[in-house]
């Protein structure tokens, strides 16, 4: 079981102000946690590789695919994109001016 000086040191390191009643409560709780870690230390871990995760993580992303602007569907695709633009201007997207100059 942790004594009060150890609990006070832990509280100081954690920048906590605790009352004497809390000291005895935390001493009991922290001792239980440390006892649990002692139990974990008894597990047979020989041959177990150290790891940071239980399973491997990897990014799952869709594969890139090239869209051809040439060919039969080029005009249809281009027009569909322009039809969804807020302010199309001919075959271009009209966007707000971000640099200085006269307003168009």
Swiss-Prot record:
Disulfide bonds: none
Region Disordered, annotated ranges: 85-104
Gene3D superfamilies cross-referenced by the UniProt entry: Glu-tRNAGln amidotransferase C subunit, N-terminal domain
Keywords, ordered alphabetically: ATP-binding, Ligase, Nucleotide-binding, Protein biosynthesis
Stored InterPro entries: Asp/Glu-ADT_sf_sub_c, GatC
Reactions catalysed, as given in the entry: L-glutamyl-tRNA(Gln) + L-glutamine + ATP + H2O = L-glutaminyl-tRNA(Gln) + L-glutamate + ADP + phosphate + H(+); L-aspartyl-tRNA(Asn) + L-glutamine + ATP + H2O = L-asparaginyl-tRNA(Asn) + L-glutamate + ADP + phosphate + 2 H(+)
Gene Ontology molecular functions: asparaginyl-tRNA synthase (glutamine-hydrolyzing) activity; ATP binding; glutaminyl-tRNA synthase (glutamine-hydrolyzing) activity
Keyword tRNA processing: no
Lineage top rank: taxon: Bacteria
Quaternary state and interactors: Heterotrimer of A, B and C subunits.
This protein's name: Glutamyl-tRNA(Gln) amidotransferase subunit C
Source organism of the structure: Synechocystis sp. (strain ATCC 27184 / PCC 6803 / Kazusa)
Gene designation per UniProt: gatC
């Amino acid at each position: 079981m942790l004594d009060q000086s150890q609990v006070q040191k832990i509280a100081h390191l954690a920048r906590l102000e605790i009352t004497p009643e809390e000291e005895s409560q935390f001493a009991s709780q922290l001792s239980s946690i440390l006892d649990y870690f002692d139990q974990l230390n008894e597990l047979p871990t020989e041959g177990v590789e150290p790891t940071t995760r239980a399973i491997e993580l990897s990014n799952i992303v869709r594969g890139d695919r090239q869209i051809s602007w040439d060919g039969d569907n080029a005009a249809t695709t281009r027009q569909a994109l322009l039809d969804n633009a807020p302010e199309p201007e001919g075959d271009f997207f009209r966007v707000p001016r971000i640099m200085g100059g006269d307003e168009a």
